[in-house]
Amino acid sequence: MKNEPTCAPADGPAERRWMRRRLAATCCAVLLALPGIAGAASSSPQRGGTLPFAVDAEPPNYDCHANFSFVLMHVVAPHYSTLLKFDTANYPQVAGDLADSWNVSPDRRTYTFKLHPNVLFHDGSKLTSADVKASYDRIVHPPEGVLSVRQADYAAITSIETPDPLTVVFHLQWPDAAMLANFASPWNCIYSAAKLAEDPTFPKTHILGTGPFVFVEHVKGDHWSGKRWDKYFQQGKPYLDGYRTEFISETAAVKAMESGRIMAQFRSFTPSERDEMVEMAGNRLEVREGPWTSYVALAFNTTQPPFNDARVRRALSLAIDRWGGTEALANTTFLKYVGGLMRPGSAMATPEAELVTMPGFSRDIAASRAEAKRLLAEAGVTNLEVTLTNRKDVPVPYGPAGEFVLAQWREIGVRGTHELLSTKEWQAALEKGKFAAAIDLAADYFDDPTINLARYVSRDLSPSNHAGSTDRFLDALYIGQAISTDTRERMKIVRDFERHAVTEASTVPLLWWNRLVVSSAKFKGWNISPSQYIGQDLSDVWIEQ
């Protein structure tokens, strides 16, 4: 018999029934998340079955190097391999994927990787070091017509060599503290060099990888599916026959989880949604919860007035009561923590005592709003009206965050309207600067300043800087922290970077997220991590029959 917690509400008088249901939901949510209880009946992996899971919206295109949203990662990750990857069971440890072994030189400026032999693309062609080089050349030096969102993360790389078909060597112009983690980025899908030579934009519209699952179809507006790659280089994997992604709203996903139509949604549910599902489905579900390397940000288009004036940007950031926002939004969204540019609780995070001295983070909202009004008057801006561009088809947390911001601006006399776009339109607006102010996403796969601060580096160096700003002081600090080998010195540089960035307020954090994943209790082999991007190739997961 399975060792599962009993969480079903007992019968009782009507006046006590509601209370018991709420206690039952809490019981399940807590017990199922405890080590040794959740998954206590798991055994050796079993083969077979198709995993159905939900994604809120469809990807705008298929290119890993150009995208930054989970709607792309969750559907394409099973088709691709990366050089390294994170071991989610022992996060943040890094493990090999295509790399069988690797070596870092004593000066940390040369990284040598030995690749697994006999790795095949899904068209039967053999992967070699040339494919790795071509993929990273595309990331570091994207050709015309190709967008490499995380290009700034790899500024240290000066050259890539392929001395033989199974060896690739990266040379750096300076030692980068985050480089090994960057080689494990889930976004660095390895593409076919031959296909890229024919058409550098091939990955935008086609799927051809070496991952555990072969692409089957994308039926727009309905689903995405993949099947097991029988020639996958990791012997015995994957365990699943395939997977099927249903493109449905978060609300529909809650009902689908309750009915058993889907087995997972890998991004997050809200606390209230979790309680509803556990109340309805009880111990058929497993709940996992943890910190999240993601926050909602507010980006201002610095190339257009009035947001080319830092005083105006800072005023609109000062108007926002972030501390009050956590209380208002924590239960109906997963917006939970106030923090700066580094995840609250992480090693490089700014302590609260220092954070509250930075513009926009004070607990004295009355004083902050008085300063906001003063700055607007000083800048000569009156009767300000702002269109806030936002994401429509992934409503949580974007919609509530946008409404919250607009309400906060009204407190200083700024009127705003909400422009709601599809993910594809929203992403295009951010990339092309077709907005005045926008709700933006800051989501990463690892807590490291080189990765986390790249979106604040000048736009000509970092395409992920949606504000379009140029700030050579931040650029210098960014390189300075990356090459620093002294932890205390690096932390000081990061603090200076953070204070300058939130004062200039081209892009500012709103609230950090808390991840809450609900899945079928029969779904095994998957571990929650602080990022919704890693651990999604599905090579290790299986379904208990």
Identify the residue ranges that each predicted region occupies:
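Acidic-aromatic pocket-rim loops
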Residues: 67, 282, 340, 347-348, ...
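Surface-exposed binding/hinge segments that line
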Residues: 15, 46, 114, 149-195
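Extracytoplasmic/peripheral linker and loop segments enriched in polar/acidic and small residues
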Residues: 365, 415-426, 451-521, 545
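Gly/Pro-rich hinge or "lid" segments in bacterial periplasmic/extracellular proteins
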Residues: 87-89, 184-238, 242, 251-252, ...
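Ligand-site clamp/hinge motif
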Residues: 230-276, 314, 402, 406, ...
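N-terminal lobe/hinge region of extracytoplasmic solute-binding protein
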Residues: 54-106, 137, 206-210
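Ligand/substrate-recognition segments at binding pockets and active sites
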Residues: 220, 335, 369, 373-445, ...
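Structural transition elements
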Residues: 336-378, 394-398
